C-alpha cells in the first residue's frame, strides 16, 4: 500500500509547503479552543467557574492589602445572556496593571512564589473574560479605584487571542461610591441549572474564610443572601515566600538553577539557593554526590604485623636513597598509622604517607618527593590488599544465611577479589560494585552450583558499600555541573538521598482549628462541632497542612449521605468530587467506629453531619488545570485521614455521651413514675407523712442534688454530690431582696434583683452549703450550670 509519506515525497518542495503551514499559537488561542480545561465546559458550570475566579481574585487582593474582605456577587438575566457582577473593597488596581490582569492569560505576580495562594498561574479571571467574549461577543467592563485616589478608572476590553494581549475599547475615568476596590462585569452564555452548586460555593467560601463578608444576589431571590464575617475573625497570617527545598526540585529545574546562580561551589549553591540547607547539610549532600561521581574507596583490613604482607618492610624496600634510619622511621610511622585503623582505603593510605613524609622532612634534611611518596603508597597498598579473599569471605559470610556452605561463600569472595584486581585503587561507584557482585554471583551459581538470590546479593552489596570509605575530593564547579546533565543528575540524586529538615511553614496560612469550628458554627445550625489542624508535612519538597471539621445534628439534613466539603488554599472544590483524594479518604474510613451509619462498611456515611477538609500548601497537587480535585498523593491522603479521625474521635465521644445521657434520662423517667407510687403505698401502710422522693431519686441516679432551706432570715442552698467524680458547679441564686453573703459568693444587683453567684467544687460523695441571710421577704430562683441536665436534680 502506498504510504502518505511516499505520496508527499512525489511532489517537489513539499517540505517547504508544510513548513509554511506551521506556526506558533498563543496561550490565549490554545485555551480559546480548549475552554473545558479551565472549567468552562458547560453553560451551567461556566457561571460557577467565573464566580469562583472573580471571588478568588477579590479575596486575594483584600488579604494582600490587609483589608477585611467585603465582597458583593450579583447575577442578572440580560436578554439571552447572564450578567455577572463582582465587587470588592480591595486596594484597587493601577491603570497600567488592570488591563493586563483581566486581559492577558498567564499574567500574575505569584507564579514563581513558593507560598500559599489561591491562584498562581494568572489564568483564572482572564479565562473568564475570554469565555465571556467568546460566547456573548461583549467586552468585560472593569471599574477600579486605587486606595487614596479621587476617581476610578473604567475599562472595556477583550483578550486578543492572536497575541494574548488586552484589546481596550474604552479607557476613561469615572466616579464610584466605593472609596477603593474593583468591580468586574461580564456577560456570557450560561444557565442557572447549577443554582444549588453556586449557592454551595458561596456558603462554602464563607465557611472557610470566616474573616470575609459575602453578599450574593441572583434572579428569583426576594432579598440577597448575606454571609457575615465571624466575630473575632481576623485576616489570615501573612505568608513568607521560601526558597525551594532540595527534595522538591526536578532535574530540569536544577539545571536552570545551576545556570542562574552566582555561586561557584556546590556548597555555596546549596546554601544560597535552597531552604533548610546549612553548612553541615551541604557537606552531607556533597558526600552523597561524591559517592556517585567519584565512587568510594574500598577499605580493607590491614594485615597482621607478623603476616607475610608486612607493610613496614614493603615501604622500606620501596624507598631508596633516604638513609637507613630515616627510611626505617618513615616506614614504621606509615605501618603504625595503618594498623591503628580497622580498615583503610587507598586515599587514606595516601594521606598517611604524606603525613609521615612531612614529619620525616621536619625531623631532618631528607626530602620525600612525589615519586618516593607514590612508591611508598603503592607498596603499602599492595601489602594491605595482598589477600582480599579472606577479608571478602568474612564480609560475605556475615550477611548471608547459614545455609550457604563455605565453598559457595569462598567462591563468591574469590571471584570478587579477582574483580578488584582490575583497578589498583579499588575505587568504584555503588552501581559498579553491584555489577561486580552480580558477575561474581552469576559465575558462582554457574560453576559451583550455588544460589545467590536478589536478597543475598543486596545484603552483600550493602556490607561492602558500608565497609568502603567516601573520598575527600572537591566536587566539580557549579558551572561544570550545569554543562553536564549526567553530573547534575548525580547531584539531584544526592540531594534527594540526604536527610534534610522539612521546609518551614511560615509560607502557609492555615485557618486554625478554632476558626474552622467558628466557620461551621456561623453557617450550620448543629448540636456538635469539632475541628483539628495537623502539624505540617511535606510532599515533593512542598509543605502542606491539613485541617478538618465536623458538624453534627441540629438542623442538618438527616436523610441521605453526609455533606463532604472540600477546600484547597481556602477555595471550595465544587466539581469532580468522585475524583478527589479527600472523597476517597472519607469513603475509606470505617465510620461505624465513630457511631455514624455506613451501609456496607464503606463509602460516604449517612446522617445529619457535615465533614469539611482543607488542604493548605505552596503547591496543591490538583488533578487538572481547572483545580477541581486533589490528586491521590499518599502523604497527603495520610494527613487527610489523620485530621478527619482526630475530629471524628470527638464526635464519637459526643455521641457516646449523648447515648449514655439518653439511657440515663429514660431510667430516670421510669424511676420518676415508680417512686411516687411506692411512696404513696408506704404512706398508706405506715400512716406517716407523705414522702419526698426528689432526694431519693437523686441518690439512686448518683445525681448532683441542689436543695434550698429557708429558716427565719437564713437561707441555705445545699449541693450534694452523689456521683463518683468531682462536680464543678456554677450556681446562681436570684433573690428579690438584698442578701448578706457569708461564705465567699459574689453578689451583683440588677434591676431590683440580686444575683448570688457561687462556684464550688464539690468532691465525690461530699456536700457544700451556701448560706446567706435576707432581712425582707424574698423570692428565690436558682440556676445551675456545669452539670448535665440528666445528672442534676434541683429541689429549690
From Swiss-Prot:
InterPro entries assigned to the protein according to its UniProt record, in alphabetical order: HATPase_C_sf, Ribosomal_Su5_D2-typ_SF, Ribsml_uS5_D2-typ_fold_subgr, Top6b_C, TopoVI_B, TopoVI_B_transducer
CDD domains under this entry?
TopoIIB_Trans
The answer, when asked if Ligase is one of the entry's keywords, is no
Q: Reply yes or no: does the keyword Nucleotide-binding apply.
A: yes
One Pfam family this sequence matches = HATPase_c
Keyword annotations: ATP-binding, DNA-binding, Isomerase, Nucleotide-binding, Topoisomerase
What biological-process terms (Gene Ontology) are attached? Answer: DNA topological change
Q: Which SMART domains match?
A: HATPase_c
Q: Which family does it belong to?
A: Belongs to the TOP6B family.
PANTHER family given for it? DNA TOPOISOMERASE 6 SUBUNIT B
What role does it play?
A: Relaxes both positive and negative superturns and exhibits a strong decatenase activity.
Under the subunit heading, UniProt states: Homodimer. Heterotetramer of two Top6A and two Top6B chains.
Protein name in the entry: Type 2 DNA topoisomerase 6 subunit B
The organism is Haloarcula marismortui (strain ATCC 43049 / DSM 3752 / JCM 8966 / VKM B-1809) (Halobacterium marismortui)
Q: Which gene encodes it?
A: top6B
